[in-house]
Amino acid sequence: MLFRSINMALGSHRPPVTAPKASTGHLLGAAGAVEAIAAVLALKSGLVPAIRNLDDPDDQADVDAVRLTNRGHPHEVALSTSFGFGGHDVSLVLTR
C-alpha cells in the first residue's frame, strides 16, 4: 500500500527509497525521531543509505530501493514516514 501511494503521488519520478529501521530495529517511541534524523543526515551528506538485509525485494514494489551500498544522490527534499501502533502515523517533508 505504501509503495502504491508513493507511485501515485510521484507519477513517473522514482526517487531513491531507504528504510533506516532495517539497521536500527524498532525503537518504539524513538523510531520516528531517529528516522527523521537519518533523513536530515542524508540531505546533508548527499548519500542515501542502503537498506540493510534487503536480499529479496518484492517485485511488485515498483520503487527505487537502495540496496547493497549507499548511493550518492544530491537532493533538496526528503520524505520521512513513520507508522506507529494504533494508527499514529506521520510524514515529514524536509528540505535543505
Residue ranges and their predicted role:
Residues 1-96:
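Conserved "HGTGT" condensation-loop signature of ketosynthase/thiolase-family condensing enzymes
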